[in-house]
Amino acid sequence: MAMMERPEVLETTGGKCWEHTFEKFRLKVYVPDNNLDGQVNNYGFRAPLLLVFEEEQQDMDSAVRFARESGLAKVAADSDSSVLFVYPTAEDGWAGAGADFYAAVIAEIKMIQVYRDGIVENYDFFAREFKGYFVRGAIFRADIYSFGKSADYVAKNLLTTLQGEYLWGPGEITPAMCSMERLSVLPDVRRKDIAVISAGNSEEINRAFDGCEHLLVKAEASYEADYYGFVKKFKMWCGRIEYEPDFPALNMTEEAGFVTVDTSPDNRSPFKDEKTHKVGYFAYYNNGISDRGPVPLVIGFHGGGDSSMYLTFVAGWWEVAHEHDFLFVSVENHQFVTATEAVQVIGELKKRYNIDERRIYATGFSMGSGKTWDLYQEYPEVLAGVMPVSALFPVYTSFFGAPVSERLNKTVPVPVFYSGGEKSHVPELPRQADSALERIQYVAEVNRLKKKFGEVRFEDRDSWENPLWGLSGDRTEQVPDPSRGSTLTIHYYDSEDGVCRTAFASVSEQVHECRKHSIENAWKFISRFTRP
């Protein structure tokens, strides 16, 4: 169950702390001080979820001392994270912890942008409903540290595929790494890809780990060194162990920054009464990219409940930027940023990087698609093209719900590659909602398509020429995605001047998500266009 009241946060040595007792476990959280401005640049997606399974329940002072002396506090501080100490509420401790204990822990952890002191606020944007406080953390980066009795529990119960509450609902919650010290039982290893640290264990126990794909055997744990040398690279994403990219090895740069913008009159976020506010971003580019002259810029906007790193790493924009040699800048907390302010960010980026002003593109997933559409309809002269994904927002209001009639673009064509999932539960395709059809009709009008979408009626969708879009493209292409067993079907629409600058695509078997296959095909189409 979520915490409906915010826990009391106390000052402690080198940071802050708080605690809470849930039904199945007691939790202590230590949030070490750091030099990062996590409210501007959100590091949560790549931050480790450091779970210390206490052998015996200890007080807060002892927990803080362990975090600091072990180096785990330093690991947490380096990524604006926390150290979590967990102990069962069962009367006989770990011996009484059931198989569902870990799922109960994970159910109280969420990765949401709005957070403070290691606590996130879960507010449903669409339902306008507060759903409680949760522990901040990335459950796909769960690193478990266990000792003696707690290690025995891990060895018997957690080295297997586990189900529970994942990011978007029920799903796999298998940990990325399990560290076990002073085991007294042979581990039951039913899954070989989980990263394992075996420290201070017998040769017999260590032999039981033979066959593990990611194994570090040590006489004694060295937590900070082990993290940076072994643990850091692992994440368990959607049931598969994956490696985080090593940007120096790839000859790439990942760079955090922010721009101070003048708050625009249409900003309805918590910054609406501030004269200025900060907009954070992370930039990704190949080293030496500017040596050959000005470079294309793709500015990206993440989905609701996500962060800039989600768009970068899950959608794979960093890989597309690496492979196709452009600058990718992912904006943080854009839900607090208007289109006017986003243009200010672009203006400042042009001062910091050698950007080709004729090749500036925008993209966004879900709620970030809404921000991309805002730029299309309010500032078309800035962009050479847009690549919104998985959301067809209403036309005549901004992301904040404010009318934009004064700035609504009606005359400036902007190249578009839009893609949506055929099995999504949100309006991603015209067939799914009349507001989605309205967006397509608007693009058709602005880009002056030969096909007359204005004649398409939502109520006639069962008899549409094309069951998803209403009208088929002048040309159609099907691009298989073998990695997901799906097909990207692209409809290309010609404008009245004979130029094809509009592509609407659907992805079979896709729900509400953003895939590298789709965005890379979007880039291949959009990158051909430049501003005059």
Spans of features found by a protein language model:
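A domain-start/cap signature at the N-terminus of enzymes
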Residues: 1-49, 97-108, 118-128, 140-166, ...
